Structure formats: C-alpha cells, structure tokens
C-alpha cells in the first residue's frame, strides 16, 4: 500500500510539473506597438498569419497602426512606393509553439482620409472588419479561417475569399462583387453593383436582400439560397446540389435555377415564360406566355412560383 501511495504521489508531481510547464509556454508575452505614419500613401497592403484586423477613422487626422501582438511575432509597418504595408515578422522557434495561447493578435488601422485606392489583405486566421466610413477603388481579401465584415464601398471590384467563416457585405456599392467561401454563411444586404455579383458557397447558406446588379450568379453544393428584393438587369443563375431556393419579389430578364435536392419557391415581379422540370415533386407556376425565360429544374423538390401583384 505504501509503495502504491508513493507511486500515486510521484505521478501527481509529474502531472503538476507538466501542467505548469504547459501553462508557462501558453502565456506568451503580448505588447502593444503603435506605428505613426507621416508619409503619404494611396494603397494599403496587409499580410499576416493570425490576427484580427479592423479599419477605423482617425479622430486626430493622423494615420497610425496599432498592433497588439506577441513579442516574438511582430509586424513591420512602413510606406513603400505609395503603399502602406503591414507585414508579419515571425521570430518564434519551434519550442515557442508548445502550448495554447489564450490571447489573440489584433491590428487596428486608424485612417485619416475617407478614400483610398487599393486595399489588399492576405491572412491565415482572424476576423476582418472594414468600416463604412471608407471608400476604395478596389478591395481584395483572402482569408483561411475567420469572418469578414465589409461595410466599405469600392468603385471597381470587391473580392472576398475565405475557406471557413461567415462573410457579410452590407450597405455598399461596387463595380463588381465576388464572394467565395468553402464552409460558412454569406450575407449580402443593401448592395448596389454596376456589374456582376458572384457568390460561391460550397457548404453553407447564402442570403441576399435589397440587391441590384447586372448579373447574379450563385453556386454551391449544400445550403439554402434566399433572394429577397434582388433585381438583376440581365440574368439570375442559381445552382445547388442540396438546398432550397427562395425568391421573394426578385426578378431578372432571365432566370436559370437548378437544384438536385430542394424546393424552389417564391415570387417574381414580371411575367415569364416558365420552363420547369422535377422528377419528384409538384409544379405550380403561372401559365404566362410573355416575358423572359425562367428555367427551373430540380430532381427532388417542389417548384412553386407566383407573380407579385404589388
């Protein structure tokens, strides 16, 4: 019994020392570094690994970049050829990765002006938020894991791509809008686009509300699509393997909707010539013979479309 008690005590001591070591390794030193920018710039480029990124208006007319970061993973901030660049500098050794950090890096960019040229962000993990106070010529965001909230407009293209995360684009105008996510939800609300809107979601739902554009294309494997008050001048094209497609007072000159497993229901604003097919399900569409084409195909699901009276 005494030998068994000593063994238990020894195991407890070893476990406690291991836990303390793990905790010590987990608690990385964090610090706030503020970079004041005096040079003039037009473009913004950020390349980082793991960090939340936010753009907010400067309250004193000065540009600065505040980096709350690990001591061994810092960021260089400088202006090069008219571009404000923020790049990660990783000085960690392999043993510095032992453990789990309980804090997270954050980059806050305080901008004095309202309009800039290009914004390019490349990140691995973290959330990104761009305030509605800014306007760019173009926006290009590439992210592995994290949410993106874009409230800033662009005169040309807005491109947002993520592997895993939710993407929000709200109250903006753009020349074109291209959103791609492998796993996550896409929400597009109150958006005016002179050109095309493309939404690609492999697994996840897509919600579009109060949107106008030239052409709308939505593709994906699994997930519902909701179009509410979405108006395309030329074409709406929706393709899904599994998921329902809902149209609420939405319209285009021509519509093409395909889903393998799911219902297609809702209302349009103008008459269409309906071309429909379902292997298992019922079809209920107007018998109109004027208007553009509305082709709807589903293998397993109902097709129910009406023309709004309003």
What do the predicted segments below correspond to?
Residues 2-27:
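Sec-dependent N-terminal signal peptides of Gram-positive bacterial secreted proteins and lipoproteins
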Residues 19-143, 149-162, 166-181, 185-200, ...:
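Acidic (Asp/Glu) and glycine-rich low-complexity loops/linkers
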């Amino acid at each position: 019994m005494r030998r068994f008690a000593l063994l238990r005590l020894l195991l407890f001591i070893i476990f406690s020392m291991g836990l303390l070591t793990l905790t010590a390794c987990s608690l990385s030193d964090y610090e706030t570094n503020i970079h004041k920018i005096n040079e003039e710039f037009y473009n913004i480029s950020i390349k980082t690994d793991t960090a939340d990124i936010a753009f907010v208006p400067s309250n004193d007319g000065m540009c600065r970049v505040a980096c709350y970061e690990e001591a061994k993973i810092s960021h260089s901030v400088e202006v090069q050829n008219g571009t404000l660049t923020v790049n990660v500098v990783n000085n960690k050794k392999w043993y510095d990765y032992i453990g789990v950090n309980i804090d997270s890096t954050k980059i806050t960019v305080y901008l004095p002006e309202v309009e800039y040229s290009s914004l390019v962000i490349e990140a691995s993990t973290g959330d990104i938020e761009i305030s509605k106070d800014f306007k760019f010529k173009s926006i290009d965001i590439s992210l592995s894991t994290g949410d993106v909230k874009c409230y800033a407009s662009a005169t040309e293209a807005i491109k947002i791509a993520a592997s895993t995360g939710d993407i929000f684009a709200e109250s903006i105008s753009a020349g074109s809008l291209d959103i791609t996510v492998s796993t996550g939800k896409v929400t597009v609300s109150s958006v005016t686009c002179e050109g095309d809107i493309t939404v690609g979601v492999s697994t996840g739902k897509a919600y579009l509300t109060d949107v106008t554009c030239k052409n709308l294309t939505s593709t994906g494997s699994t997930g519902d699509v909701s179009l509410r008050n979405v108006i395309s001048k030329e074409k709406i094209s929706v393709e899904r393997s599994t998921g329902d497609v809902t149209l609420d007072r939405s319209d285009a000159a021509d519509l093409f909707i395909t889903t393998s497993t799911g219902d297609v229901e809702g209302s349009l604003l103008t008459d269409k010539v309906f071309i429909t097919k379902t292997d298992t399900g019922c079809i209920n569409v107007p018998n109109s013979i004027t208007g553009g084409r509305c082709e709807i195909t589903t293998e397993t699901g109902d097709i129910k479309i009406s023309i709004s009276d309003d």
